[in-house]
């Protein structure tokens, strides 16, 4: 069975990838399976740069096909912040709750209709064969930032991200509902179309 390594230790993300790839008889591994590997520093200025950086570096270290995603929250009223700094918006160590608090605090006086935001996901796939360049797909999900947390599901900024088509926070959605509209779900569907060509050599 062919292996694909997903460059994350976030088990929520690993599950999303595993559900997709098992249909193609591809085995998904995560960074938990390679504890000796050091995390790649995300020094890129865009989600795409960071995703390619991670995928490429790990693909060479592991001699495997690696998928890396870089995703985050873009808030119009904050001039695009937290952006590529979404995971560490409130500083180190990474803390979802502190990040949410910081976004809410910075939007404190902003009216709901001006709290437009989107989740963005760039997915890069790198191959151990030196002649194959990394490939990339992306996805977005539009919404608004709520004034307080809602829901228990998901991770990251999901509790404060309001999805209009469901009239719910992302964290109130079932995993099926979330996958149908989420930035990562949309990027994964684009990736799915490419699996035969990119992973199975068809």
From Swiss-Prot:
Cofactor(s) needed for function: Mg(2+)
Active site: 70 (proton acceptor)
GO molecular function annotation: dITP diphosphatase activity; ITP diphosphatase activity; metal ion binding; nucleotide binding; ribonucleoside triphosphate phosphatase activity; XTP diphosphatase activity
GO cellular component, one term: cytosol
GO biological process: nucleotide metabolic process; purine nucleoside triphosphate catabolic process
EC number: 3.6.1.66
Keyword flag Metal-binding: yes
Residue positions binding Mg(2+): 41, 70
Coiled-coil residues: none
InterPro entries registered for this protein in UniProt: dITP/XTP_pyrophosphatase, ITPase-like_fam, RdgB/HAM1
Function: Pyrophosphatase that catalyzes the hydrolysis of nucleoside triphosphates to their monophosphate derivatives, with a high preference for the non-canonical purine nucleotides XTP (xanthosine triphosphate), dITP (deoxyinosine triphosphate) and ITP. Seems to function as a house-cleaning enzyme that removes non-canonical purine nucleotides from the nucleotide pool, thus preventing their incorporation into DNA/RNA and avoiding chromosomal lesions.
HAMAP family assigned to the protein according to its UniProt record, in alphabetical order: Non_canon_purine_NTPase
NCBIfam families given in the database record: PRK14822.1 (NF011397), RdgB/HAM1 family non-canonical purine NTP pyrophosphatase (TIGR00042)
Assembly mode: Homodimer.
Name of the featured protein: dITP/XTP pyrophosphatase
């Amino acid at each position: 069975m062919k292996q694909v390594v997903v460059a994350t230790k976030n088990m929520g993300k690993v599950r999303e990838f595993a559900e997709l790839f098992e249909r193609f008889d591809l085995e998904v591994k995560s960074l938990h399976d390679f504890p000796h590997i050091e995390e790649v520093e995300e020094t890129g200025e865009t989600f795409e740069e960071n995703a390619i950086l991670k995928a490429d570096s790990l693909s060479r270290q592991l001699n495997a096909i690696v998928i890396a995603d870089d995703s985050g929250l873009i808030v119009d009223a904050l001039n695009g912040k937290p952006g590529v700094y979404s995971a560490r918006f409130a500083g180190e160590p990474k803390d979802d709750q502190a990040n949410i608090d910081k976004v809410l605090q910075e939007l404190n006086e902003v009216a709901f209709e001006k709290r437009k935001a989107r989740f963005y996901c760039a997915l890069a796939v790198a191959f151990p064969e030196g002649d194959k360049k990394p490939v990339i797909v992306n996805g977005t999900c539009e919404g608004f930032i709520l004034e307080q947390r809602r829901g228990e599901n998901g991770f990251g900024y999901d509790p404060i991200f309001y999805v209009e088509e469901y009239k719910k926070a992302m964290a109130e959605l079932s995993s099926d509902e979330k996958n149908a509209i989420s930035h990562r779900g949309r990027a994964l569907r684009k990736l799915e179309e490419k699996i035969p060509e990119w992973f199975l050599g068809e």
